[in-house]
Amino acid sequence: MRIPRGLWGIVKEVARHLLRRPVVGIAAAARTEDGRWVLIRRSDTGEWALPGGTLEWGETLRSAIERELAEEAGVRVIGLGDLAGVYSRPDRDARFHAVTVVVHARVTEPEKPPVNPAEILGVRLFDEDDLPDRLAHGMSDMLADARGAEPRWE
């Protein structure tokens, strides 16, 4: 079936407006009740990161954070806390423009392995003075901000 030229132009314009929108990302600055940080090790780079992902259609931020923590780190949320930061610079990630909301979370210790081992190599609890140096893109700022007193807005 051939789409008329005028209609094709309309379809392309609508797609351009609908698909060129920032992705909504979430990450959890998650700590166990004894204060250890929960970090995941990414399989694509081997680097450490805060657990997180993208908001799915119909999800709230709370449900997305709970889902990602369960899937990636095998932990349950005990309570969500304050905002750690909002990251929206278009050049922050070369793959796409994301607006990432990072919140503090109090969680259980890992109860099960990550759901997708092709995405997550492992989960580890880190003491404050033992945090890894090798962090995934953008995570150094996010973790530093989560350790600070004031949330970041960019």
Mark where each language-model region is.
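Acidic, metal-coordinating catalytic segment for phosphate/diphosphate chemistry
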Residues: 1-27
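A structural signal for short, well-ordered beta-strand segments
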Residues: 28, 83, 103-105
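Active-site-adjacent beta-strand/loop module that shapes the phosphate/pyrophosphate-binding cleft
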Residues: 88-112, 142, 146
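NUDIX/MutT-family hydrolases
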Residues: 102, 114-147
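Conserved hydrophobic "DFG−1" position in protein kinase catalytic cores
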Residues: 30-31, 39, 105, 125
